[in-house]
Amino acid sequence: MKRKIIVGSRRSKLALTQSNWVINKLKEQYPEFDFEIKEIVTKGDRILDVTLSKVGGKGLFVSEVEQALSNSTIDFAVHSMKDVPSSLEEGLVIGAIPKRESPLDCFVFNQVSSLDDLPKGAIVGTSSLRRAAQLLKHRPDFNIRPIRGNIDTRLQKLHVENFDAIILAKAGLARMGWLENTTLKLEDIAPEVCLPAVGQGALAIECRESDQLIRDMLATIHHEETGICVEAERVFLKKLNGGCEIPIAGFATKIGEQIHFKGLVGNADGSKILESKEIGENPGQIGNKVAEVLLSEGAETIIEELRNK
């Protein structure tokens, strides 16, 4: 009889698609195992009428899943990396980070087809303070309005609630097959306009530190370059003690042996944005260095002001 591996996942279409993608990759290597998904509802899934920045706290989409891991209800969990706090629960580790999808944010337009064509005062939907702050720096005339829900729900709201545009992660659109939908008016947002969230486009597969069988299994789908880049980003996030209530962005790429990392902290209306870049070979050192530069330039004051609102 085959051993069954229980995989923890949120129950959104995107989360289940991502979990099934991981399972199919593992089945190629381990046909002797059966895999079963256990759907878990998180705090972030239950609270849909409030923006995440107002809910506060860390791990809004992972805490209940980590609890299931800690009490051995599941064997591993599949998360979107950008949802995973910079510090994990004791006894848990990231067992693998597969190859990253696009890290970029993406405009989905209602009528026009490019950022430059959006009219003055355009209504743009996003509940991300990171996206809002950077867009307002670029276009202070924008009217940013919160929008929650899964990808399908947000795409419906684009028209029903008369947004001029909404912003989604391109990776989610890709995984759900929406990039092939020719009826959508899409445009990538350059990192110079909107730097991605830490870990955006990457998956995090979390397991128990003590479960060597699962760790060995997950190691077969780990992508080293993605892991190195995400490490730099997450070290940066941890140093700043960031969460979804702070406009923080961080994005690393690897060119040859060099890691190129840019980090950003801003206030909610985009009137003050601090940025720093670093190049080097050690991801942890680079992430720390960029965070230290931003802290020396006043990032701590921005973060405290936002937390005390």
Swiss-Prot record:
It holds the Pfam family Porphobil_deam. The gene is hemC. Its cofactor is dipyrromethane. This is Porphobilinogen deaminase. It catalyses: 4 porphobilinogen + H2O = hydroxymethylbilane + 4 NH4(+). One of its GO terms (biological process) is protoporphyrinogen IX biosynthetic process. InterPro entries: HemC, Porphobilin_deaminase_cofac_BS, Porphobilin_deaminase_N, Porphobilinogen_deaminase_C, Porphobilinogen_deaminase_C_sf. Binds 1 dipyrromethane group covalently. The modification S-(dipyrrolylmethanemethyl)cysteine is found at C244. The keyword Transferase applies. GO terms for molecular function: hydroxymethylbilane synthase activity.
